[in-house]
Amino acid sequence: MPHTARATATAGPIPRLITIGETMMMLTPEHAEPLATASKLSLHPGGAESNVASHAAHLGIPSAWVSVLGEDVLGRRIRTSIERHGVDVRWVTNNPDASTGVYFKDPGRGVLYYRRDSAASRMGPSTVASVPLEQAEIVHLSGITSALSSSCADLVEAVFERVAGSGASLSFDVNYRPSLWRAGAAAPALLSLANRADIVFVGLDEAQSLWDCVTPEDVHAILPDTGRLIIKDGDVGATEFSAGTRAFEPAIPTEVIEAVGAGDAFAAGYLSAALRGDPTAVRLRAGHERARLVLLSTSDFIAEPVPTQTSKI
């Protein structure tokens, strides 16, 4: 494995929420227009798990994000930006032998990724060796990480093994990305991980692609033992199965500018409410409220703490 520089960990309270996963530099049109004709682009960090940590931090939950970045200007910018959101980045490291990944948002048309052999794709179990996962209340990661590389899949397995049996709960967002792996390979791997998690987030559309599920009940049938199973159905709403009960909360009517990142915002809103001890309906509503803010923006995140954080290119 290439040498990876360790971050200097400073002493401090263990965050209630620890997230683990890749973050790239995202370039997005400043306005809701196609990438092909946009004249101004903005730079923002973009990554499922750092998004969750940033949203949760803005909601008052002490949160940390763990990852590996390149030893480059983009990596330094990402770390600084996420830290300014109030996220604990003491366990973020830099790999001098690999670059930070980049991706472009094309509003309404998808995303273009440039992440091959990125620093984060070289993460492995050693990435979390010094992270006190067992002392957090919730550890959150997603299925994206498993698809990045074999060492990243080993990282996910190590996290699951360490959190199992500890006082922490394991939160897992299925986050299936067809651009990273085919459904034939992803379906059994993601189902196995979801069955071992305490809290699972999955979109009904991705459950259909992966496991031929048509209804929330179909998803519950293949994940019957999950402590809290949250199934998101776009502009319809979200269903939670927990403690032998089923609850549904309708989505908030919203004019969607860009959907990418809304799932991360939902997870953060839900987890923050769960850490506050809120009941099911409040948890689901908190997820919808946070997701709505992202749906109204071209960014994965909202409420930038420093106006100058966005640079035009």
PLM feature segments, named:
Residues 1-18, 216-313:
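Conserved phosphate-binding/catalytic region of the ribokinase-like
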Residues 2-87:
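Glycine-rich phosphate/adenosyl-contacting loop at the front of the ribokinase-like
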Residues 23, 144, 174, 265:
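Active-site metal-binding loops of divalent metal-dependent hydrolases
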Residues 30-40, 141, 245-254:
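Glycine/charged-rich beta-loop-alpha catalytic/anionic-binding loops adjacent to active sites
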Residues 116, 144, 175-179, 205-206, ...:
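Active-site beta-loop-alpha junctions enriched in small/polar residues
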Residues 166, 179-246:
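Conserved phosphate/ATP/ADP-binding segment of small-molecule kinases
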